[in-house]
């Protein structure tokens, strides 16, 4: 998926276990480029079921994206029997991404009363993946053009609702525009018109 705005009521990927063990060379691959993504409940969830315990590994490559999620959600959420097994199910390669609003980046719940849920903050997320898997990431600080419509149903969201400031007026907005392939120095001058916004959708080139 590339150069788009996505608004999802649940998650981008919600996976349940299967009865049969998947082949060793089978995985789910997500490639995300220059997106602005709103997911009400986080990006990914994996759930083992009593009679469907087998989950496919997930590999994500994400570059120059802005991920926005409900503050109560977890970016990645897993309901599994083993924390170690859960960590092996996710492979992440991130480059120059922005993360907004949510604070739990990875949550693993085993259901065992003797094992506390694993919850990783942004700093722990970066420490786990290190620079080989998560480069130049930023949490918070996107200069939005206006308040985000967090209480509006996702189906009513518009790309302009998630626009950043005019890149000629803000350094971070300029950086986002550069990552989206629209360097501020190369943007044509457009005189302001009544009812027209000069903001561009963060992380994407759509209008």
Write out the residue ranges for each language-model feature.
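Extracellular beta-rich repeat passengers
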Residues: 1-207
């Amino acid at each position: 998926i590339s150069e788009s705005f996505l608004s999802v009521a649940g998650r981008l990927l919600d996976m349940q276990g299967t009865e049969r063990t998947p082949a060793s060379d089978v995985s789910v691959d997500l490639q995300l480029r220059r997106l602005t993504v709103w997911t009400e409940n986080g990006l990914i969830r994996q759930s083992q079921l009593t009679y469907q315990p087998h989950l496919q590994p997930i590999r994500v490559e994400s570059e120059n994206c802005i991920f926005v999620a409900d503050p109560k959600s977890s970016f990645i959420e897993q309901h599994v029997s083993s924390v170690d097994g859960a960590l092996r199910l996710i492979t992440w390669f991130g480059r120059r991404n922005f993360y907004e609003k949510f604070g739990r980046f990875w949550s693993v719940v085993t259901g065992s009363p003797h094992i506390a849920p694993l919850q990783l903050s942004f700093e722990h997320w970066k420490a786990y993946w290190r620079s080989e898997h998560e480069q130049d990431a930023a949490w918070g600080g996107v200069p939005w053009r206006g308040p985000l419509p967090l209480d509006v149903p996702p189906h009513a969201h518009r790309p302009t609702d998630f626009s950043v400031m005019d890149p000629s007026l803000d350094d971070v907005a300029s950086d986002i525009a550069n990552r989206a392939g629209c360097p501020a120095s190369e943007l044509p001058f457009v005189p302001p018109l009544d009812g027209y916004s000069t903001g561009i959708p963060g992380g994407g080139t759509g209008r």
